[in-house]
Each structure stands twice: as structure tokens, then as C-alpha cells.
Amino acid sequence: SFLEGMATLRQLSFGLLDIGWHGQDPSSIQRVKDFENEEFQETNLYPDIAENAMSPSFSHIFNGGYSSGYYSYKWAEVLDADAFAYFKEHGIFNREIGEMFRTHILSKGGTENPMKLYKRFRKQAPNPDALLQRAGLL
């Protein structure tokens, strides 16, 4: 879809910034803007506005329970797209796949390692290509 690549890159950059902030000693960061420039180096497509610092207003990564977990937005989309692709491969209303989803995902909740549960359901690790295909990026 239109500008899907930009939206995806934007979310990835937010996740990388979050992990960057929580992956090192904050006292080692001298200037917020320099730190952001370093973190956004791989995802920035356009020149940045020198006076603009995102971190001070990006409350998700400092309060609200997302500390070093902002990436989970995009990861949830990967899981959603990959699980739905599995349903589509076997017929959207396939009873056996639905039962496997209920048995290995829904009924287990947080009682076991989520990746182990997902692999039991899907019989493989989540494939990010499913999200890229759904978004029209592959």
C-alpha cells in the first residue's frame, strides 16, 4: 500500500531508538541529538532537522511500560501476519489449524515460552516475510 515502506521504517527506527536508550549507560550519552542521529543512521532517508530531538517527547519509551519493548508493536504484526498466512495456506476456516491455534496459543496464555508455543502451532519460527508480503513490500 501507499507509503507502507516509510511507515514500516519509521516504526523500526522507533524500536531501534528505544533499544539504544535502554542498552547502555545513559551517562555515556553527551548530547541527545547526537545519540539519536547515531541510532537513526540506518533508517533515516531524509536529512534531519538539526533542532529537532524526538526522545524528550517520546513518552512510550520512558514511561508507560514500553522500556526497551517498543519493537513489540512490529513483532506483534509479524506474528499476526505469519499466523494468518498459515491459516490461508490450509484454508481460512480449517478446523485442524483452528484447533492447533487454540491448543498451542490461546489456551496456554503466558504459561510457557511464547516462541516455543508459536513453533508448536506453526511448526516453524515466525517468518517476517509474511508481514512484508501483506504490506506489499515483497
Each model region followed by its residue ranges:
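Cation-handling catalytic/transport regions enriched in His/Asp/Glu
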Residues: 1-138
